[in-house]
């Protein structure tokens, strides 16, 4: 078996490392640099340039020079953030046939994984030149908050580059591996704050000695997949554009050549201000008007830059609070803080993080290289070269299905250790129902519509039977890469259907970030909605039971009693169309009372009618029968047959 290399496929820069004699080593590229810009350019003579060569010619070829492509992976063209990106980048973002966001270069549409594959090829060749042998296997890192679609797309990029991706590993987890491998033995809880070029992650990780084995267990992870160094650059670019406009009256934002020069200058100034208190952005001949050429010359102080980006830094602290809360820890219980990603070199970022955790971050972890080093170590673990290391990562978002009334029923909760498999038994909601729909969701909202649909599929040809009798086993299988497989099986016939969540149905970066924020902001709203749905389900169940009792009673019920029950049914059905919980409860109580005497009468003749009546419907889906049986399409029910 050949070497398994470790690749940090970054938004701004990428890095490759190998395990050499038990130690991880970052490999220099052909230009002698340890990191490679994640930039790809297509020239007029048909050549594809990657890395520094592509970056050097960007000013003269802006429309065919692609950067920050990682931020497009898993996105739909119509997403708000993609529409915003279209206005900010000099190249063309186009809509693919399936609605995804692709790029267009010289009349050809390219998928983000295709473009990312060019960077991976460069990393692959860098490793091959160093090792003197072919490399076919790799561990590739992704932001911890990447969704299923983005992980799939990253694997696709690896395959296009000629690499078998042995494992997708989360960037903060990889950094923890790099940190923990050469440290003294002992249990520690560390926080990895990863602010890269395009994404932000925070992971709380416990490093422990367990029977002589170093165990890295992720306790919680959180993040923002649309926050990174690119956003810091944009803030400074906007400031420079405004300054130039106020001085000259000319707006540079529509000039792609000028904006490309500004982007380079802003990035350079931002980096300089991490060490200096002031720098000068000097761009001669930036544009021209009837009076002649115009030059841009703006002094920028560190204080000015910090005032421009302070809100961005502050935005990174909310996920930190959530991650600590999910891990059940306080900031004072964190033993070490590790900073990862080039943007963490900014003094303001270091100060805010130190203030938040109450301690300075370690300085012995290289923020640009730690992730690739960790990926190489994981490659060594998979290849058997590294012993006594166990990595326990987690899934960042809850996975579940839609249940009765539009509620999301979780199967795998967020921060569950992966790989994992969860099964639950569902049943039919209606008599003689022959099919159920399994609607797979990802997110933190109770209301299904507030989460992202990952896909749906039907299990058909269920033998006709009374409601609640068929048993349909739904299985969620989440692998070590965080990629999901879902299957549904009719236990009586053995008939099975399954779905692998594909990239075209995945979440966008903005959607993931937004759904977590929405969940926190709408917690009370969600609770009220859930209670209303449960009450409606109880009402539906009571209506079903009352009608069935009337039907079975036949001529044994007198006309006045029958009319009273039918009136109560109509009033309850009308009440459930509204949102007034008290009104629904009153009508439910009225029907319960009206049908109580009749049900008691019938109980002696038909012992199981009362239990049947207590069951609740599950839309097209399902109903819980026993401890592990819940409404297939829709709602869980307790053993006492009452809706939760």
UniProtKB/Swiss-Prot annotation:
Amino acid composition bias (Acidic residues), ranges on this chain: 628-638
InterPro entries reported in the protein's UniProt record: ATPase_NBD, Chaperone_DnaK, Heat_shock_70_CS, HSP70_C_sf, HSP70_peptide-bd_sf, Hsp_70_fam
SUPFAM superfamilies for the chain: Actin-like ATPase domain, Heat shock protein 70kD (HSP70), C-terminal subdomain, Heat shock protein 70kD (HSP70), peptide-binding domain
A molecular-function term among this protein's GO annotations: unfolded protein binding
Start-end of Low complexity biased regions: 604-621
Domain of life (superkingdom): Bacteria
Gene3D superfamilies: 1.20.1270.10, 3.30.420.40, Actin, Chain A, domain 4 (3.90.640.10), Substrate Binding Domain Of DNAk, Chain A, domain 1 (2.60.34.10)
Record protein name field: Chaperone protein DnaK
Gene: dnaK
